[in-house]
Amino acid sequence: MIDENNDVSEEALSSDIKKLKEKHDMLDKEISQLIAEGYRVIELEKHISLLHEYNDIKDVSQMLLGKLAVTRGVTTKELYPDFDLNLND
């Protein structure tokens, strides 16, 4: 906790450290489980990178569809069939 003088209590710091250690342990267990299932760290990093790229492209696409919808005076949803897009995607 931070008091009026911007001082952090030792108790608050200890609590934060404990929570971080617990999170670290949990993540270590998840990594070990993924490795046991046959995943490799490099593959996971590549997959995460590709997901970020996909999300960036999707965000730009949604922005462009929104601008086109405004120009045409329709909703974005109404444009999906024009571009063979899945409404659930």
Swiss-Prot record:
It is found in: Nucleus. Gene3D superfamilies: 1.20.5.170. GO terms for biological process: cellular response to ionizing radiation; double-strand break repair via homologous recombination. InterPro entries: DNA-repair_Swi5 (IPR010760). GO terms for cellular component: nucleus; Swi5-Sfr1 complex. It comes from the Eukaryota. Keywords: Coiled coil, DNA damage, DNA repair, Nucleus, Phosphoprotein. Residues 10-38 form a coiled coil. Component of the SWI5-SFR1 complex. Interacts with RAD51. Belongs to the SWI5/SAE3 family. Component of the SWI5-SFR1 complex, a complex required for double-strand break repair via homologous recombination. This is DNA repair protein SWI5 homolog. It comes from Mus musculus. The lineage of its organism: Eukaryota, Metazoa, Chordata, Craniata, Vertebrata.
